[in-house]
Every structure is written in C-alpha cells, then in structure tokens.
Amino acid sequence: MNGEEQYYAATQLYKDPCAFQRGPAPEFSASPPACLYMGRQPPPPPPHPFPGALGALEQGSPPDISPYEVPPLADDPAVAHLHHHLPAQLALPHPPAGPFPEGAEPGVLEEPNRVQLPFPWMKSTKAHAWKGQWAGGAYAAEPEENKRTRTAYTRAQLLELEKEFLFNKYISRPRRVELAVMLNLTERHIKIWFQNRRMKWKKEEDKKRGGGTAVGGGGVAEPEQDCAVTSGEELLALPPPPPPGGAVPPAAPVAAREGRLPPGLSASPQPSSVAPRRPQEPR
C-alpha cells in the first residue's frame, strides 16, 4: 500500500507543475512566468510500478557476474612488435614531390604508364593497327591472338550445300537449322556460304548475258538500210536509168506521192508501144 500511495501522490504532484511556484508575482515582469512554458511541455513518464526491482538493480550487479578486465596493450607481443617498427617508418624521409623523377627526361614515359586496351575483344579487330605506326609510341602494336580463321568445308559439306542451293537460292531459317545440325556447322557459316554463293551465281549469270548480246543472238548481223533510198532529193539528183520496156522504177511511187518526179516519168505505168510476141505454133 505504501507503493500505491507514493504513486498517486506523485501523479497529483505532476498534474499541477506550478503549485510550488505560486506566489506574489511582481506587478511589472520582464518575461512571463516559467510555469506557462512548463505547462506546455509533455509531462514526464510516471515512475516504475515496481520500485523494488529498480532498487535491486541500482544496488549493484549480482555477485556471480564478474566484470571483464581488458589486458593492457603493452602485454601483447604483436602490438609491441608494431611499436618497435613504427618509429623507424616514421623517421624515413618522404621523397620530394615533383612532376618527373630524378634523372628522367620529361618526354620519356615509363613502361607501366602506357595506356593499355581496356577490353580483350578489342585485340581481335584491326581498328587499333594505326597505333603501332604512331610516332608517339604510347600504343604498342599487339599481335592479334584471336584473329578469326577461315572456315574449311569438307567435300561432303560442300556437296550438300550445293544440292540445297540448286533447289533454293534463299534458304529459310528452319532449313538452315536443319542443315547446321546435319553438317555439324553453325547457322552463321551456312548463312555466309549462301550469301557468297548467290554473289558468285549472279556474276556468272551477268557474264552469260553479256556474251550473248555481244554476238547478236544468232551471230548474224542485220543489213543496214540505204540512206539514198529514203532521201527524195538525192533521188532527183541521181535518177536511176529506166529499165527496158518503159517500166516505172520502184522508187517512182514514193517520189510521185511527194510531187517530185523526174522528166519523162509518170505516176501511172504507161502501156508499152511494143506488143509482146506470141509464140509460134509448130507446123
């Protein structure tokens, strides 16, 4: 019961924090009373409901728990060894900081300072071949270890590929996978082979077409048309001799349509004055 009475008495005391500060206040105060600020603050937590347990803890630790004693660092042999070598290292003079070491020329760089290619796959390409010929020499020409070699096809593989190309100039993806499994090749090898084979086939076709047009198909040249027949002026200047019997030359109708006929010729054929001879009957 004593604990409960102390608890309730404490709570009543904390309910009115200004109880001990009530008194005659001065008429003119420079600042408001402190109880106003104390009233705004949250009340402190109530005391522990079991004061006996707290008192036991405050008295001390149980006798069976002994405090841990930390050994001094000087007794540790490893720490003593470090202390033995530490002054010697601190006594070493620091090298002078400068842009270049002593005895080195500014234009010469050391081997570890050379710029290396960051990725190994960059060695397999020829994109950095110019660095070996550069006068600066910062980039050293490295041998191309991972250079891609040319694929050597066997006769059986070439035979199957040629047979497939004979039927299909453009291979499909499922058929390409099937050929890759059957011929023990990759899809990329088959794709590249078909691309090269198509280019070769197109060149052969172009060569065949070019040879046929140069010969002229059957190898027979077409006769050229005479320009004197199509020109009417040249026909008037050089009239052909009339054939016997007064027949009109074949070029006369063309000249008659144009309205230009040589003298002695007419558009219509004239009857011959000489009658044809009849064959004599046998007696």
Curated annotation (Swiss-Prot):
Activates insulin, somatostatin, glucokinase, islet amyloid polypeptide and glucose transporter type 2 gene transcription. Particularly involved in glucose-dependent regulation of insulin gene transcription. As part of a PDX1:PBX1b:MEIS2b complex in pancreatic acinar cells is involved in the transcriptional activation of the ELA1 enhancer; the complex binds to the enhancer B element and cooperates with the transcription factor 1 complex (PTF1) bound to the enhancer A element. Binds preferentially the DNA motif 5'-[CT]TAAT[TG]-3'. Changing Q59L: Risk factor for type 2 diabetes. This is Pancreas/duodenum homeobox protein 1. Residues 146-205 bind DNA. The keyword Kinase does not apply. The modification Phosphoserine is found at S268. Interacts with the basic helix-loop-helix domains of TCF3(E47) and NEUROD1 and with HMG-I(Y). Interacts with SPOP. Interacts with the methyltransferase SETD7. Part of a PDX1:PBX1b:MEIS2b complex. A motif (Nuclear localization signal) lies at residues 197-203. Duodenum and pancreas (Langerhans islet beta cells and small subsets of endocrine non-beta-cells, at low levels in acinar cells). The gene is PDX1. Residues 13-73 are annotated as: Transactivation domain. Residues 41-50, 238-252 have a biased composition (Pro residues). A motif (Antp-type hexapeptide) lies at residues 118-123. PROSITE patterns: HOMEOBOX_1, HOMEOBOX_2. InterPro entries: HD (IPR001356), HD_metazoa (IPR020479), Homeobox_antennapedia (IPR017995), Homeobox_CS (IPR017970), Homeodomain-like_sf (IPR009057). The Antp-type hexapeptide mediates heterodimerization with PBX on a regulatory element of the somatostatin promoter. The homeodomain, which contains the nuclear localization signal, not only mediates DNA-binding, but also acts as a protein-protein interaction domain for TCF3(E47), NEUROD1 and HMG-I(Y). Its main location: nucleus.
